[in-house]
């Protein structure tokens, strides 16, 4: 035995990839070796000239140990900084059974509602929490963060408002990070932001206004009068409200506002150095068709039973494109589920107890300081006590004393210091903080504390009265409720999810473990830099790896979704061109096949979209591109292009595309949605891209979470790097200081970055290169096998696809009347989530198997589609009626096959169409959901409890 052969640092790659299947897969596609296969699939013209410059792989154990060492460099002080981020307690039953459970975090956005009823119910619970606390009848299923939500509220106010003005009022008490993001958005919408004292909001004419409730320094103001005066002028009013304070305070709707928004982080979601967290967004019913983001609605299924679905989806970017209400794609579904379940578990009395405890501790602390002669700035507050010492020296001394005792305070200005209380604050903290503020060791406080909120500010209505918030307060009940919901969903812990352009790959357990380590989860985004050395090292490691992979000169981690990455990349181009004196460049070329987020993003930046045709092979029409680039030469800003193409093909002309755009004065933005087909094979910067966004929740193993979180960092060439997003409160060490932000936190959803770090570290150079090759091989295997039954719409060199393929269902539809939707729903009966339906071509399925699926799983999926083809042919031959067959009736539930049966096909054909289905049957909990009924009768709050009964 050789010891060197018994240690295998590449062990993780063998868990991520199915090396034992290589020979069979290669033989099926007619190749002898992996090198030969790649050579016949990838154009030589794009191949990178050298190998990846990445470290060798580490084992799972060694990678975790190394990351633990990095994490230990973060300092966990008790955070009293506030500004929208607070320590909280994640109930352990929710931590283990939702956040750490692949049944929840590996699911995709619930487009296929019939196999997503569990998380749809959880998201409906979240919406109900937001509806109850804000007082509005409609709430969305989450936005990316509070700052983004505020910017979306501003845009929505302009869409729905009647005031003919381009001016928007911003309360001077809003969080600085919120104002930072609003400045970015306002510039390219052409809005003028007026930041002033809240009481002066009605001094001018504004199309909209935003107020902070509670203010950034802790004060709570009665906004009812000023809102009333603005409403009399027709101004649309938004209120950014602290979610925990709304447990006690009057709702924004009662104050007279039109929109409410904020962060739900305080409801059981760790701070995580800035995210991810679910923002809430609630509004008047009249605005529902203009709202950003997703809304979960109650509809009915084919049997008439209540069923949930995503409502009003025609607002979304993939349908409306440049006319969309926003470019949002990924939201924060997993975090919304955590926040909603926090309210379910604690119930109305539990959250009131927490809110009152926070307020009582802050009030007791303020009382003690006042009795000691210290100037507490605000008499009315919820959780934040701001003190003015009158001189800088004393403020410095107090701040340092608190730091020495392990407490982070907020420095408001030279003479003022603030302490923000929170769910984890304890009576011992009062003693420590009192000592830091006064220098005295003894602190006696009365058990009976008088609150600082005036009676006229307090809500009089009841909250969280729906039975779902009053039933699951014991751990056994909560555990079983979570399990019941999980069992209604099909996630990747059951079967592959082959969604094209979504890259649903393995989210390995070792990758997920570190996100709940306190060293990562308990860090405030604005903690002193000396306390975040571990995060800085993690970011530096990842920056080096991503630069090597992509060939870019700089990386910005701020964008907290793919759509935000797009926006940030195009924003850098716009800023660069303005700095060059070329602000007139406002034309954006976008291929016809592009992701819907592309035109929506371009429109948000004030760019005019010019569509470039594609040829019969699905590639960009070079002649049309050249003509349009030359036509708009003086105004050309950029092209937005996806590579490999959205049609799943390596376009051989990519270098020519980049050259033509550059020759005509434009920049090249590359959409990184398909980066999984590039790593180790090509570098986007080397073929001519100037900026690229990377979906860490696709290519780099962050799970999709049932609709978020995501991360969309951007890679930039040197000339664009100074124009990456900056931040008002944190040194990003990249962008120029004067560049405003795109997200509330400087490094986006930083606490999920360890997932990608672990993936990169455990795969190493060799593993990352192998992953791409396997992604190509699996896709071509699927395409080859399915081509025996279905046309493959687009292929490239040697009849090959890249990492995904498009199956054309239109001929079958013409012959039989069976639609792509029927086939998607029928796949549920076989235990599979459908591939991407009707994108980028109507009447098709786009399949992306990824590298981490075994041949056995691919064969099951292929067998399902082949059997479905035979079922369609039966309909076409008249053996089954067009109006009554297993496809149009799909999916079938357990209730269907145990009740009356009058169909021309058997129960077995309905639910056990192939032998493997019997081994691990997934039962959809509802029949096909009626989308039209749901949109015509929109209900986005929890239905009566009897609807939940089994």
From Swiss-Prot:
GO CC, any one term: cytosol
A biological process from GO: glycine decarboxylation via glycine cleavage system
Pfam families per record: GcvP2_C (PF21478), GDC-P (PF02347)
Xref: HAMAP family: GcvP (MF_00711)
Subunit comment: The glycine cleavage system is composed of four proteins: P, T, L and H.
Function statement: The glycine cleavage system catalyzes the degradation of glycine. The P protein binds the alpha-amino group of glycine through its pyridoxal phosphate cofactor; CO(2) is released and the remaining methylamine moiety is then transferred to the lipoamide cofactor of the H protein.
Descriptive protein name: Glycine dehydrogenase (decarboxylating)
Organism of provenance: Neisseria meningitidis serogroup C / serotype 2a (strain ATCC 700532 / DSM 15464 / FAM18)
């Amino acid at each position: 035995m050789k010891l060197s052969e018994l240690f295998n640092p590449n062990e993780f790659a063998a868990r991520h990839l199915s090396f034992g299947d290589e020979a069979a897969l290669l033989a099926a596609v007619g190749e002898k070796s992996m090198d030969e296969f790649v050579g016949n699939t990838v154009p030589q013209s794009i191949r990178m000239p050298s190998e990846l410059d990445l470290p060798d792989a580490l084992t799972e154990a060694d990678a975790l140990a190394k990351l633990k060492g990095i994490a230990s460099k973060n300092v966990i002080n008790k955070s009293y900084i506030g500004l929208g981020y607070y320590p909280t307690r994640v109930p352990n039953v929710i931590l283990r059974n939702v956040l750490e459970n692949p049944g929840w975090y590996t699911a995709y956005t619930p487009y296929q509602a019939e196999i997503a009823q569990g998380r749809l119910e959880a998201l409906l619970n979240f919406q109900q929490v937001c509806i109850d606390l804000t007082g509005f009848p409609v709430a969305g299923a989450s936005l990316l963060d509070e700052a983004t939500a505020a910017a979306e509220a501003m845009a929505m106010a302009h869409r729905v408002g009647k005031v003919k003005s381009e001016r928007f009022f911003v309360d001077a008490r809003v969080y600085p990070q919120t104002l930072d993001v609003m400045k970015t958005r306002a510039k390219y919408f052409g809005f003028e932001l007026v930041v002033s004292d809240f009481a002066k909001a009605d001094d001018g004419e504004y199309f909209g206004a935003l107020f902070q409730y509670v203010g950034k320094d802790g004060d709570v103001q009665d906004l009812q009068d000023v809102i009333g005066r603005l409403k009399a002028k027709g101004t649309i009013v938004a209120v950014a409200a602290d979610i925990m304070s709304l447990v006690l305070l009057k709702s924004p709707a009662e104050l007279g506002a039109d929109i409410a928004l904020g962060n739900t982080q305080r409801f059981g979601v760790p701070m995580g150095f800035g995210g991810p967290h679910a923002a809430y967004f609630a509004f008047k019913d009249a605005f529902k068709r203009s709202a950003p983001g997703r809304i979960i609605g109650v509809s009915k299924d084919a049997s008439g039973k209540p069923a949930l679905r995503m409502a009003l989806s025609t607002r979304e970017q993939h349908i409306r494109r440049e006319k969309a209400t926003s470019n949002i794609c990924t939201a924060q579904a997993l975090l919304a589920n955590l926040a909603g379940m926090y309210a379910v578990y604690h119930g109305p009395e539990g959250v009131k107890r927490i809110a009152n405890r926070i307020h009582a501790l802050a009030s007791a602390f303020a009382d003690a300081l006042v009795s000691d002669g210290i100037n507490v700035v605000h008499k009315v507050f919820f959780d934040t006590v701001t003190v003015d010492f009158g001189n800088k020296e004393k403020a410095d001394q107090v701040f340092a004393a608190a730091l020495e005792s392990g407490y982070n305070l907020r420095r408001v200005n030279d003479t003022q210091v603030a302490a923000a209380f929170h769910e984890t604050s304890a009576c011992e903290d009062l003693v420590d903080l009192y000592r830091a503020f006064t220098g005295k060791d003894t602190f006696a406080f009365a058990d009976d504390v008088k609150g600082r909120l005036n009676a006229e500010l307090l809500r009089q209505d009841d909250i969280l009265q729906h039975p779902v918030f009053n039933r699951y307060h014991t751990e056994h009940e909560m555990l079983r409720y979570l399990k019941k919901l999980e069992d209604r969903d099909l996630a990747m812990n059951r079967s592959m999810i082959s969604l094209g352009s979504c890259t649903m790959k393995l989210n390995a357990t070792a990758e997920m473990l570190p996100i709940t380590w306190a060293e990562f989860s308990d860090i405030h985004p604005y903690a002193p830099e000396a306390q975040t050395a571990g995060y800085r090292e993690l970011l530096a490691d990842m920056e080096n790896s991503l630069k090597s992979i992509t060939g870019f000169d700089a990386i910005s981690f701020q964008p907290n979704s793919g759509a935000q990455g797009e926006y940030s990349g195009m924003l850098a181009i716009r800023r660069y061109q303005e700095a060059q004196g070329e602000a007139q460049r406002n034309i954006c070329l976008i291929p016809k096949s592009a992701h819907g987020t592309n035109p929506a993003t371009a429109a948000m930046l004030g760019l005019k979209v010019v569509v470039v045709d594609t040829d019969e092979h699905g590639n960009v029409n070079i002649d049309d591109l050249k003509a349009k680039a030359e036509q708009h030469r003086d105004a050309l800003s950029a092209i937005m292009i996806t590579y490999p193409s959205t049609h799943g093909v390596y376009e051989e002309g990519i270098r020519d595309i980049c050259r033509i755009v550059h020759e005509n004065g434009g920049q090249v933005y590359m959409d990184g949605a398909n980066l999984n087909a590039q790593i180790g094979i090509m570098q986007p910067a080397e073929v001519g891209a100037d900026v690229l966004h990377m979906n860490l929740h696709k290519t780099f193993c962050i799970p999709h979470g049932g609709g978020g979180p995501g991360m969309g960092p951007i890679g930039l060439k040197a000339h664009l790097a100074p124009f990456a997003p900056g931040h008002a409160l944190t040194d990003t060490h990249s962008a120029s200081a004067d560049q405003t932000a795109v997200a509330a936190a400087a490094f986006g959803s930083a606490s999920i970055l360890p997932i990608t770090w672990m993936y990169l570290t455990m795969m190493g150079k060799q593993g990352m290169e192998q992953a791409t090759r396997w992604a190509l091989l699996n896709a071509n295997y699927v395409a080859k096998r399915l081509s025996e039954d279905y046309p493959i719409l687009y292929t490239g060199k040697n009849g090959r696809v890249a990492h995904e393929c498009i199956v054309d269902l239109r001929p079958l539809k013409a012959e039989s009347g069976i639609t792509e939707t029927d086939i998607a729903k029928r796949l549920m009966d076989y235990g599979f989530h459908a591939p991407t339906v009707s994108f980028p071509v109507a009447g098709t399925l786009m399949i992306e198997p990824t590298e981490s699926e075994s041949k056995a799983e691919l064969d099951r999926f292929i067998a399902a589609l082949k059997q479905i083809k035979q079922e369609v042919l039966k309909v076409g031959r008249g053996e089954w009626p067009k109006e009554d067959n297993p496809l149009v009736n799909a999916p079938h539930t357990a209730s269907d096959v145990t009740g009356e049966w009058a169909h021309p096909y058997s129960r077995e054909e309905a639910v056990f169409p192939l032998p493997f289905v019997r081994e691990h049957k997934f039962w959809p909990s509802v029949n096909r959901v009626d989308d039209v009924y749901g949109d015509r009768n929109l209900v986005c709050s929890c239905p009566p409890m009897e609807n939940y009964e089994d």
